[in-house]
């Protein structure tokens, strides 16, 4: 069975777009792959974080994974900072990366421009740590969006470089892009991806939004003026985005949605979608609360940490042996 790895930062509550584009797809693939789902809190601290808020959001994200349908008997869910091998392997990969290739990373450039009190070194060395996250578990598949594709390509380059210098120690991962239609856009500006860090709360629906508030956001979402319910990302981005959300939450094919609402106006469609979103959030949040407030969540994270440590420790030892670190035993 091939291995799949995915990491999400606990830097905010995931949106309904994250659910449709990632979490829901993870539930589908956990039967077909040996899956590792990592809450990458060490990546989060490359930018300043409030420690209490970070810990709360880490626990929230773990509960969200489980509420989405991740089964701890099928997949490994764990917290990055609880498995020391990540920073160990991250440092080893940092030593074979060049400053030039790290400075060329688009996310580094974007975040460096926003840095107020100097550029944190962690922003620059973020990609080798991300590469370590992946290679530690002999990962074959990494599902990512366009914004992370460059980092995975760097990971593949670092694997090639490491294997060339120290023999074939690491597995080279392949990139898997999200399914077509899995990309959910901003509700008020459907040319931009929905983001949990958006300054305007009307642009996104958080998985922990109050359901009635989320329904209002759907009803006020931007659409065009012709009133025809048709999936056309280039010419009708607003209604296309809402159709994507409808399809993502109901599993109804897009063609069937178009047929169902043929001759209907946007008001009817938005009203129905608002109720679908509301019902989804009510059920989702009930599951979330049952995990967040339970000791079972800690048991699952302990179990995931122990398995991740066992697997990653073996990879780190292979890397250290290849590089000549430590004593020969």
Swiss-Prot record:
InterPro entries: aa-tRNA-synth_I_CS, aa-tRNA-synth_Ic, Rossmann-like_a/b/a_fold, Trp-tRNA-ligase, Trp-tRNA-ligase_bac-type, Trp-tRNA_synthetase. Belongs to the class-I aminoacyl-tRNA synthetase family. Catalyzes the attachment of tryptophan to tRNA(Trp). Its EC number is 6.1.1.2. This is Tryptophan--tRNA ligase. The keyword Ligase applies. Keywords: Aminoacyl-tRNA synthetase, ATP-binding, Cytoplasm, Ligase, Nucleotide-binding, Protein biosynthesis. SUPFAM superfamilies: Nucleotidylyl transferase. GO terms for cellular component: cytosol. Homodimer. The keyword Cell membrane does not apply. A motif ('KMSKS' region) lies at residues 193-197. It is found in: Cytoplasm. A motif ('HIGH' region) lies at residues 10-18. L-tryptophan binds at residue 133. GO terms for biological process: tryptophanyl-tRNA aminoacylation. It comes from the Bacteria. One of its GO terms (molecular function) is ATP binding. ATP binds at residues 9-11, 17-18, 145-147, 184, 193-197. PANTHER family: TRYPTOPHAN--TRNA LIGASE, MITOCHONDRIAL (PTHR43766:SF1). The gene is trpS. It catalyses: tRNA(Trp) + L-tryptophan + ATP = L-tryptophyl-tRNA(Trp) + AMP + diphosphate + H(+).
């Amino acid at each position: 069975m091939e291995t799949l790895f995915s990491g999400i930062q606990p830097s905010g509550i995931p949106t309904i777009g994250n659910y449709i584009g990632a979490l829901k797809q993870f539930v589908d693939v956990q039967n077909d792959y040996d899956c590792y789902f990592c809450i990458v809190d060490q990546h989060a601290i490359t930018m300043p974080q409030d420690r209490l808020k970070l810990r709360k959001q880490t626990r929230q994200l773990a509960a969200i994974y489980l509420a989405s349908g991740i089964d701890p008997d099928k997949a490994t869910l764990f917290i990055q900072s609880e498995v020391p091998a990540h920073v160990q392997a991250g440092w080893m990969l940092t030593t074979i990366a060049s400053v030039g290739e790290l400075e060329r990373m688009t996310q580094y450039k974007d975040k460096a421009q926003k840095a107020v009190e100097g550029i944190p070194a962690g922003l620059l060395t973020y990609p080798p740590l991300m590469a370590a996250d992946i290679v530690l578990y002999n990962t074959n598949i990494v599902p990512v969006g366009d914004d992370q594709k460059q980092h995975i390509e760097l990971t593949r380059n670092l694997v090639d470089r490491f294997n060339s210098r120290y023999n074939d120690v690491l597995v080279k991962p392949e990139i898997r892009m999200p399914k077509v239609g899995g990309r959910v856009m901003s509700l008020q500006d459907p040319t931009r991806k929905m983001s949990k860090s958006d300054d305007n709360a009307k642009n996104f629906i958080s998985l922990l939004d109050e359901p009635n508030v989320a329904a209002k956001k759907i009803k006020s979402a931007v659409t065009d003026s012709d009133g025809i319910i048709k999936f056309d990302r280039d010419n009708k981005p607003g209604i296309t985005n809402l159709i994507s959300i409808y399809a993502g939450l109901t599993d109804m094919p897009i063609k069937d949605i178009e047929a169902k609402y043929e001759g209907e106006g946007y008001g009817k469609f938005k009203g129905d979608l608002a109720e679908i979103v509301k019902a989804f959030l009510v059920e989702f949040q009930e599951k979330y609360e049952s995990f967040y407030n339970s000791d079972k969540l800690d048991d699952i994270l302990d179990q995931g940490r122990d398995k991740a440590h066992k697997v990653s420790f073996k990879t780190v030892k292979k890397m250290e042996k290849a590089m000549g670190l430590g004593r020969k035993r």
